[in-house]
Amino acid sequence: MLFRSVIAAGGGIVAKHGNRSSSGLSGSADIFEKFGYDLNMEPAKITDILEKFNICFMFAQKFHPAMKNVATARKTLGKRTAFNLLGPLTNPANVKNQLIGVFSEEFLDRLPMILKRKGAQNIMTVRSEDGMDEFSTSAKNRICFLKEGKMFTNVVDPEIVGLHKSSLKDIQISTKVDALKSFVSVLNN
């Protein structure tokens, strides 16, 4: 989520499709909602926001109402499932370029190949070696690129790219309030 905000601030266009947290403390929808974003906004209004600010959020339950029927079961399970893969596969903006965090290494190369069949052009999937489904500063990050129809894999070490290596406990949050504070802190620094 944070990485996407930085991309938008740098002039990139971000059409984030997401949901409330089902397996962690805070999902993308939780963060946007805390900032006062209307999760049930109509698509035309979301398009206006994207054109004006280069970033928008599309609440999965608004665009795919059937997902409401599995929300309680997902929360009860408390772990990542195939439903976590549906977001990138069903992004209503039909984006051609995506950065996707995956919860299992087996999806690093599988997800880009599925999206390629749907017309995607440039896809990057990432999973950190400490188990996070996003870039981490506490471990190396395994990435897979789909670019111009070809797949590439690599490992990104935070120290090699000039970042301070942290411990996992330094970046873990324990409450939704902590998640919001951490998000705002990074944006302000």
Residue ranges and their predicted role:
Residues 15-21, 83-86:
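Core alpha/beta catalytic barrel or barrel-like domain that forms the active/cofactor pocket
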Residues 11, 33-40, 45-189:
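Glycine-rich anion-binding loops and their surrounding alpha/beta cores
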Residues 21-38:
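Active-site-proximal loop->helix
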